[in-house]
Amino acid sequence: MAEDTVMPPVHPGEILLEEFLTPLGVSQYRLAKAVDVPARRINEIVHGQRRITADTALRLSRYFGTSERFWVNLQARYDLETEKDRLGTELDGIRPLSEAS
């Protein structure tokens, strides 16, 4: 019988690396130059050490031909899942308004 395993949230940088850079043969440095940002920014995103900001989302979407919302939504989903994990059962103590009356 398989154990229930909770997968950690996937950082948008992992998506950037695994779904875009690696398959397309684009280096982090090449991407940074193409979208006019410091190479360190791309490296930190790829390593999960930096968020994808609106500025970066606009640049990535232009370069890869995706929507801006694609990148922003990846980051928002990651942020929500990470925060949900951090809060743990603390949210269980909050009664919804409809149940509070």
Briefly describe each language-model feature range:
Residues 49-62:
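Short, basic-rich loop-to-helix N-cap that marks the start of a DNA-contacting helix
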Residues 72-101:
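Short, charged recognition helix plus adjacent turn
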Residues 38, 49, 64, 75-78:
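The DNA-recognition helices of helix-turn-helix-type DNA-binding domains
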Residues 2-26, 73:
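A short, Lys/Arg-rich alpha-helix, primarily the initiator
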Residues 1-4, 99-101:
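Intrinsically disordered, low-complexity and often Lys/Arg-enriched segments
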Residues 23, 34, 63:
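Residues within the alpha-helical elements of helix-turn-helix
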Residues 26-44:
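Short alpha-helical DNA-recognition segment
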